[in-house]
Regions:
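Membrane-water interface of alpha-helical transmembrane segments
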Residues: 28, 72, 76-86, 222-225
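Interfacial aromatic "cap" segments that immediately flank transmembrane helices
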Residues: 13-40, 119-146, 157-208
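Hydrophobic alpha-helical transmembrane segments in multi-pass membrane proteins
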Residues: 34-53, 84-101, 133-158, 194-240
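Hydrophobic alpha-helical segments and helix pairs
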Residues: 94-127
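Generic N-terminal leader segments that precede the first folded domain
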Residues: 5-67
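Juxtamembrane transition segments at transmembrane-helix termini in multipass membrane proteins
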Residues: 1-7, 14, 18, 55-70, ...
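Alpha-helical transmembrane segments of integral membrane proteins, especially early/N-terminal helices
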Residues: 43-64, 115-128, 156-157, 195-197
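Long, highly hydrophobic alpha-helical transmembrane signal-anchor segments
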Residues: 56-81, 118-138, 210
Length: 287
């Protein structure tokens, strides 16, 4: 990692370049997380979405035909199924996906601090945080839902709290602390943060557009949907790397947290692909 990563906030180009480098350098352990955590989630989501679509189709057909005493029970049953499976999708996003996100983020931190990349340790620590993920996830979900009803506060907080999962996984925050910690890192930099998140989202959407071709290889819609969901998580893993790097950079610059490794432990190659030990511009000027 370039020395100034821990002392200066990087710009978008530096962050994005580092994100591609870290993602490529750790593709094997990231794929392991995808296979162990996100592949089962993809299959689960495919089942949930399939059932929700069926229920919604019935709901729509009855609504268009007109609700009467003869179909009233079916109408409310279909409505219940739509709401139930929508709730399941929300729970998966709040409680299961963060486990994989934290595992990848921990490997990013291991990489930038020049520690040995341990997939097993990262995944084990992520699973051990499940109680905190659930508790903080409930608080986050309820508050985001309530503020989203007013739209503008919901948009503001969704960006201000973007680091709440990383605060749980990388900084050991609990309860409301992850949201406060994230907001402190975004304070005064909301638009800059929003812009970078938008850039990551655009890259992920471009990848996902290419991944839509996977549907043509599977005649079974449910299997095709599961494969597509999994490939979308590949894009999401890149976004996670980008967000984790931004979090670590902001945290080190804001709080002076000793994220940087000892000089004797640092290998020659940096995160951005430069070689450590070469004279810096300031050192060359001194000479």
């Amino acid at each position: 990692m370039n020395h100034d990563f821990f002392y200066r906030e990087w710009n978008w180009i530096e962050q994005l370049s580092a994100a591609f480098h870290v993602f490529a350098a750790n593709i094997k352990p990231i794929l392991k997380v995808l296979l162990i955590v996100f592949l089962p989630i993809s299959i689960l989501e495919s089942i949930i979405n399939g059932r929700m679509l069926n229920a919604y189709t019935v709901f729509q057909q009855i609504a268009q035909a007109g609700v009467s005493l003869s179909n009233e029970a079916d109408f409310f049953q279909a409505a219940y199924q739509v709401l139930f499976h929508s709730g399941l999708t929300l729970l998966v996003g709040l409680f299961l996906q963060p486990v994989g996100t934290i595992a990848i983020a921990k490997m990013v931190k291991q990489f930038v601090t020049k520690q040995e990349i341990s997939f097993g340790t990262a995944l084990g620590e992520a699973f051990s945080l499940m109680p905190t993920i659930v508790f903080s996830g409930i608080i986050y979900g309820v508050l985001i839902f309530l503020t989203s009803l007013i739209i503008v506060p919901g948009i503001y907080l969704s960006v201000a709290w973007v680091f709440y999962v990383y605060a749980i996984g990388l900084s050991d925050k609990k309860g409301m602390e992850p949201m406060r910690y994230s907001k402190a890192l975004v304070k005064g930099k909301w638009w800059r943060t929003f812009g970078y998140l938008l850039l990551l989202a655009v890259i992920a959407m471009l990848w996902n557009s290419a991944f839509q071709l996977s549907y043509s290889f599977f005649p079974n819609a449910r299997i095709g949907n599961a494969v597509y969901q999994f490939l979308c998580y590949f894009s999401a893993a890149f976004v996670t790397v980008g967000e984790a790097l931004l979090f670590l950079n902001r945290e080190a610059v804001t709080y002076g947290i000793p994220t940087e490794p000892a000089a004797e432990d640092a290998p020659a190659e940096s995160v951005a692909g430069t070689v450590e030990g070469e004279p810096t511009e300031n050192e060359e000027n001194k000479e």
